[in-house]
Amino acid sequence: MEFSIKQSPLSVQSVVKCIKMKQAPEILGSANGKTPSCEVNRECSVFLSKAQLSSSLQEGVMQKFNGHDALPFIPADKLKDLTSRVFNGEPGAHDAKLRFESQEMKGIGTPPNTTPIKNGSPEIKLKITKTYMNGKPLFESSICGDSAADVSQSEENGQKPENKARRNRKRSIKYDSLLEQGLVEAALVSKISSPSDKKIPAKKESCPNTGRDKDHLLKYNVGDLVWSKVSGYPWWPCMVSADPLLHSYTKLKGQKKSARQYHVQFFGDAPERAWIFEKSLVAFEGEGQFEKLCQESAKQAPTKAEKIKLLKPISGKLRAQWEMGIVQAEEAASMSVEERKAKFTFLYVGDQLHLNPQVAKEAGIAAESLGEMAESSGVSEEAAENPKSVREECIPMKRRRRAKLCSSAETLESHPDIGKSTPQKTAEADPRRGVGSPPGRKKTTVSMPRSRKGDAASQFLVFCQKHRDEVVAEHPDASGEEIEELLRSQWSLLSEKQRARYNTKFALVAPVQAEEDSGNVNGKKRNHTKRIQDPTEDAEAEDTPRKRLRTDKHSLRKRDTITDKTARTSSYKAMEAASSLKSQAATKNLSDACKPLKKRNRASTAASSALGFSKSSSPSASLTENEVSDSPGDEPSESPYESADETQTEVSVSSKKSERGVTAKKEYVCQLCEKPGSLLLCEGPCCGAFHLACLGLSRRPEGRFTCSECASGIHSCFVCKESKTDVKRCVVTQCGKFYHEACVKKYPLTVFESRGFRCPLHSCVSCHASNPSNPRPSKGKMMRCVRCPVAYHSGDACLAAGCSVIASNSIICTAHFTARKGKRHHAHVNVSWCFVCSKGGSLLCCESCPAAFHPDCLNIEMPDGSWFCNDCRAGKKLHFQDIIWVKLGNYRWWPAEVCHPKNVPPNIQKMKHEIGEFPVFFFGSKDYYWTHQARVFPYMEGDRGSRYQGVRGIGRVFKNALQEAEARFREIKLQREARETQESERKPPPYKHIKVNKPYGKVQIYTADISEIPKCNCKPTDENPCGFDSECLNRMLMFECHPQVCPAGEFCQNQCFTKRQYPETKIIKTDGKGWGLVAKRDIRKGEFVNEYVGELIDEEECMARIKHAHENDITHFYMLTIDKDRIIDAGPKGNYSRFMNHSCQPNCETLKWTVNGDTRVGLFAVCDIPAGTELTFNYNLDCLGNEKTVCRCGASNCSGFLGDRPKTSTTLSSEEKGKKTKKKTRRRRAKGEGKRQSEDECFRCGDGGQLVLCDRKFCTKAYHLSCLGLGKRPFGKWECPWHHCDVCGKPSTSFCHLCPNSFCKEHQDGTAFSCTPDGRSYCCEHDLGAASVRSTKTEKPPPEPGKPKGKRRRRRGWRRVTEGK
């Protein structure tokens, strides 16, 4: 369509963006000088023929469109080539143009605006009463050609006054800026999609800038190849394409319409599309560009964890689809744009999205014919061939054009194959799909059945009653018949699943099932039981209660105003009967294909569909219209699970919100059958829950119910299950568990208090095992075992692999695994080597895991009965994503990864397994199997497994498995370190903040009598009485003045300890030193900084705490000694001074002051400290052990270790001189010279283990203590018996090279020695065969230095004990 507007001769021709213009009279004036009306006549004529596009605007003046400034990204002079573009993508409108003709063109050198008519096609003139686009008026101005001007003038002359007033009201309707933009962009798409448009000769004269390339308008066009980035997925190859609903490939997004989006389709084996922001697109150049894009994305990552995530390789789940997309993209890059669009553009048939048959065939996917597609999607051939039905001819042109748009807007649905995992995101959202349930997702909640419960007529009435108000609000001038036609056109576009939403659920009388779904399980107020819907259960279970996720405010508001809306819409006779019958819920939810997405997302009401919570392998699964990329103008989604066209209001209790632990109500489990459900709660002290059937009851008892144990008063111990009267209850109110004191003491997590004990069910075993000093184990939501006192935090991070989850807060832990007879993989297996020295021998085996040790390696005696290793006693269990070694069948120990049951294939999930078993993924072979703790042990960095790896067969597979396991181990380690670092940087470790010292145990705080407190000579009239610069006697003696004794009284300035007058400080995270304390203001030299506050303990308690810290790997100490009997421990309790770090050149020092008779420690500045400087003091650490802690203070005189004296100036100068002196040249030793490596076996018995090494130079012999007849290691320098005569103890001269027998010169004559072929002697206790066998393990006598054979590390003194590798 072409439109022309006559302008003044002084105007300059340019193309306008839209039709409705508001200009000042001097800018857009008529020829006679009169100001035309800013509102142009609504009646218009449309000319469907070729014509030139010309319009004139005042040069240099910013145009105003609908009262708004023109959009900056498309200036008026860039729309000159609209003349050859298809209007809104309509078929048959390739020659339609918009033309504005001037009334007078005098003085302008442009040819007359004639309308060239196509040969054989007469000029068609249609009078449009109203035109709609997306449910809104498209043109509201009068657009007149030469022939239409007379018609408009005649109509204006014949108008009645009331018609004029009505027309003026219509003019006040504001034109939607989004539709204005959509008009222009639709025309741009049409221009690009029609390559055969003919050039108009008059075009170059009237629009001199028409030939400018379209790339100046938009960065990408249809057919362009790009990389797109979707959150959580790698860069993916795409092609820009037109949206089937909007008929445009680009649009503006955000509140200010300042962020541009492009519609792209993803390459791969599944047809998927999305709207992506321009900043998330990069032009495609080839596969080699991928690494560069990943590096650039990582540079912009806000956190280290995000950077690691962006740089990690593509997961195996996405690799195949991504590689297929790369192949298709590179193939498309070699084609022309037209060939590319013809081959790779998706087919939109009915309400389904399909791959091009040629592409599907190449991808190995069975492609349907177009006829089958149309038949399956419900599109009739008749409607496809004859889009203009007889009924459509009766519809006015405005509505007909609206219907055309809606009929061509086909909603999409992803490929039904759940195995597809290419990127997908239906921006306009598939109306047939449930909210947040893309392909591959499970629907874990109760969804509406697909079958319709009412006939089509009743459903249509509900649909009309629901959406009639919105249509009326948007088209106030439409009649009732027109409203009904619009609703019918929208109804015809809905799929069967969408229509099923408008069943009697929205009627005045609710069905019985709606009442059943109300969630009222039983009438008892105290019973908070909620039935958890298991993901494997039927999705149509009717007895599952539902939980309200969000209440629609529009729905609540409209229920209150039903009568008002009924009265307001009663004038529409065609819909009056339907409205009066169905008037319960009037909510805003227009058709998905006919309403802007953002508005639909906000205004749509509750749609009964399922939420899928399992993570999809496709980026489109997590990418909705509201979260394509983080544009600053983007509006946030109301819910993370909202799709583009419908909102979810109800989900079952198995929602992700419940999985995150948001629900605070406890879910009870029957104590007899260990299953949830409708339970009867005991109101006694046990707080138990029971099924009526388990108790043998048919109905709920009246009045107060108590179980048999509470009624008798004899409870059973939760550990040993014996019923006795000496059991005690846990002090936690809601716990209700009873224990024998001896039984509960066996668990290290039991906390004894003055009023009783807190049982282990209130602390996480995993958190305590990993860090016993961390108070976190007792915080957070717990999942507790129903059979024993074991609990874990909710979530996969703490929950042990193999636990059976029976409710949201109840499990059966792995300790209850029962091995079945006849199943070989249930048998317990132990390794055949020691976990310490890696040698065989007599091993002590753990009864719970495969670990084995030499008793000597653990420095213990061989225990009697069953024995458990330290890890098993501490409660350490395997967790998901742990890398382990697994023993299965006759195979060697094989590296594998612990998997979550929901992440393994369905056939593995269905395998029969017991409580305590978990699935593992074997590296190399890519197999899965169920195993348990007794056949696995953790993988450690550097493990190599079997030394016989080979290059063929299973040996090569094992070698690949080791490489994969090592890579996966490092990847998981980095992820966990990044997560721990992020958590630790949030806030300092917890402690209790106190203001004054708190005595602990027998320690007392001294308080002096007022008469004993010294009195200073200061006067209240002094400038600074008792101040920092005064001559206060108490300050000089480091006594604090007492307010009742000091002559200065309230003016005394020597009460910093009592008044806690500290300068303002703050806690910061330092580099390499943990947390530190910095000053927020300048501090003068000698000024009081802080008091060192904590618990006052005695030396006995101090040593006990240090011992406990060493046993539990606690390396941080906060102890400061006041005197022999009192020590300040600021670890569990303290103030900000506990965060001050050590420095060898500190800016603060500790001084002991006497405050009210008691000695207290203060920190004072030793120099002027500017603001922002870290506060430090010298710890003067007293080391109790031999290990030293490295000092990281960075001072010039740093001693290198905490506790060592800092280097003095003399020491530093001597070190400088020593550096300057010439170093003596040393002779380079030959390889192996001067080194001594001990043997790995005992020289007497020949076995390995914990050995004592000989201190004689060049001697490599080692012995067991038992072989030497010693009970403990010898002290000091020790020489083995081989160097001393067996008879007299003198130095030996004759040696047996097979045993420690040796003799001096006096006694060697009576001993028979023989020689081996290599010249080595041996005593008579050995025969020649043994000599030949063991001769390779012997050395020459000590006088002759032999070559070291073993790989033992040299140690000093009696501590030289071999350790196996």
From Swiss-Prot:
A Pfam short name: C5HCH
DNA-binding region: 453-521
Gene Ontology process terms (BP): atrial septum primum morphogenesis; atrial septum secundum morphogenesis; bone development; double-strand break repair; membranous septum morphogenesis; methylation; negative regulation of transcription by RNA polymerase II; positive regulation of isotype switching to IgA isotypes
Binding-site residues for Zn(2+) 1, renumbered to this chain: 1016, 1018, 1026, 1032
Zinc fingers (PHD-type), renumbered ranges: 667-713, 714-770, 831-875, 1239-1286
Annotated S-adenosyl-L-methionine binding sites: 1075, 1115-1118, 1141-1142, 1186, 1192
Enzyme Commission (EC) number: 2.1.1.357
Region (Disordered): 149-170, 376-455, 516-658, 1207-1232, 1333-1365
Keyword Isomerase applies: no
Outcome following mutation: residue 1179 to A: Loss of methyltransferase activity. Reduces levels of H3K36me2 in preadipocytes
Biased segments, Acidic residues type: 632-648
CDD domains xref list: HMG-box_NSD2, PHD1_NSD1_2, PHD2_NSD2, PHD3_NSD2, PHD5_NSD2, PWWP_NSD2_rpt1, PWWP_NSD2_rpt2, SET_NSD2
Domain PWWP: 222-286, 880-942
Cross-referenced InterPro entries: AWS_dom, C5HCH, HMG-box_NSD2, HMG_box_dom, HMG_box_dom_sf, NSD_PHD, PHD1_NSD1_2, PHD2_NSD2
Residues where Zn(2+) 3 binds: 1144, 1191, 1193, 1198
Phosphoserine modified-residue sites: 121, 172, 376, 614
UniProt keyword annotations, A-Z: Chromatin regulator, Chromosomal rearrangement, Chromosome, Cytoplasm, Disease variant, DNA-binding, Intellectual disability, Metal-binding, Methyltransferase, Nucleus, Phosphoprotein, Proto-oncogene, Repeat, S-adenosyl-L-methionine, Transcription, Transcription regulation, Transferase, Zinc, Zinc-finger
Residue stretches making up the SET domain: 1063-1180
Binding site for Zn(2+) 2: 1026, 1041, 1046, 1052
Domain Post-SET: residue ranges: 1187-1203
Any one GO CC term of the record: nucleoplasm
Consequence the record notes for mutating residue 1019 to R: In RAUST; decreased histone methyltransferase activity H3-K36 specific
PANTHER family (UniProt xref): SET DOMAIN PROTEINS
Purpose: Histone methyltransferase which specifically dimethylates nucleosomal histone H3 at 'Lys-36' (H3K36me2). Also monomethylates nucleosomal histone H3 at 'Lys-36' (H3K36me) in vitro. Does not trimethylate nucleosomal histone H3 at 'Lys-36' (H3K36me3). However, specifically trimethylates histone H3 at 'Lys-36' (H3K36me3) at euchromatic regions in embryonic stem (ES) cells. By methylating histone H3 at 'Lys-36', involved in the regulation of gene transcription during various biological processes.
Protein name in UniProt: Histone-lysine N-methyltransferase NSD2
